[in-house]
UniProtKB/Swiss-Prot annotation:
Keyword terms, alphabetized: ATP-binding, Cytoplasm, Kinase, Magnesium, Metal-binding, Nucleotide metabolism, Nucleotide-binding, Phosphoprotein, Transferase
Pfam families, A to Z: NDK (PF00334)
Species for this entry: Nitrobacter hamburgensis (strain DSM 10229 / NCIMB 13809 / X14)
Coiled-coil features, chain-numbered ranges: none
Protein name: Nucleoside diphosphate kinase
Gene: ndk
Family listed: Belongs to the NDK family.
PANTHER family on file: NUCLEOSIDE DIPHOSPHATE KINASE, NUCLEOSIDE DIPHOSPHATE KINASE DDB_G0292928-RELATED
UniProt xrefs under SMART domains: NDK (SM00562)
């Protein structure tokens, strides 16, 4: 099994409800290490760049507005098959369809306010990590 890194964001709905510790506990229980973490307020430009892949979708503006509505926690996670493992513990985008015990089943309030983002591939993770962290901020 390969040791990988993936990128995670605890979204404004999660930080507003002080869920950082609870979500981090689920991440660590799944065997992933948090090797970088910081609480930030995304700028509109950062959010638009980060979600540029969705620019043509009807929900893009609402997504950007949500992501800049409050603080987020950006993270780099490390572990065996980190991308897949993190996606499994996040659960389905729609919390009503998420498996029991997943972050979204436990904490998300809707499809839009689903508490967490996770990279979908190692290549995507590398790009997303570089958008928010410099090399010396990642201590693995």
């Amino acid at each position: 099994m390969a040791i990988e890194r993936t990128f995670s964001i605890l979204k404004p709905d999660a930080t507003a409800r002080n869920l950082t510790g609870a979500i981090n506990a689920l991440i660590e229980k799944a065997g992933l290490r948090i090797v970088a973490q910081k609480r930030i307020r995304m700028t509109r430009e950062q959010a638009e760049t980060f979600y540029a892949v969705h620019k043509a979708r009807p929900f893009f503006g609402e997504l950007v507005d949500f992501m800049i509505s409050g603080p987020v926690v950006v993270q780099v996670l490390e572990g065996e098959n980190a991308v897949l493992k993190h996606r499994e513990i996040m659960g389905a985008t729609d919390p009503s369809k998420a498996a029991d015990g997943t972050i979204r089943k436990l904490h998300a309030t809707s499809v839009g306010e689903n508490s967490v983002h996770g990279s979908d591939a190692t290549e995507t993770a590398a790009v997303e990590i570089a958008q928010f962290f410099s090399g010396n901020e990642i201590v693995g």
